[in-house]
Amino acid sequence: MNMIYKVNHPISAQQFIELLDKSTLAQRRPTDDKKCMEGMVNNSNLMVTAWDGDTLVGVARSMTDFHYACYLSDLAVHRDYQKRGIGKELQRITQEQLGEKCRLILVAAPAAHSYYGHIGYSNNPRCWVLGRDDRIS
């Protein structure tokens, strides 16, 4: 396997959807909402992808200021390519793009919660989420 990693290489919303469908992430993303998925792909300012030839097999999709914080919003690896270090490499390359003081932040999927501590992340119990239908009171 000769994996090629690319930084900010354009991908289509359809390629992104197909990858999510072949990973575990589609369960938690609106893959049936093409407009939303297009917005997710087109408005990310840091995307690292993994390719096996012409086949997209992994993605780390982030929003960042490159100096203080980088939110890694999606990390997906095709199920046939999992447990080969691709996800870890996507994160390493993402971190490589950031300034020396920039933190990498993510919300772990329930099944992946223990994985992130194993590769060096520290758990932060102070995270809060305001859902789309929730309102500031």
Segments and roles (model prediction):
Residues 100-106, 110-136:
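Conserved active-site alpha-helix within GNAT-family acetyltransferase domains
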Residues 77, 83-96:
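Conserved acetyl-CoA-binding loop-helix of GNAT-fold acetyltransferases
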Residues 49, 55-64, 71-76:
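Conserved beta-strand in the GNAT
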Residues 1-34, 127, 137:
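Short amphipathic alpha-helix that is part of the acyltransferase structural core
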Residues 5, 98-101:
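Short, flexible, glycine-rich and Lys/Arg-enriched loop motifs at helix boundaries
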Residues 38-49, 102-103:
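A short helix-loop-beta-strand connector motif used in the catalytic cores of GNAT acetyltransferases and
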Residues 10, 66, 109-110:
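Alpha-helix N-cap/helix-start capping motif
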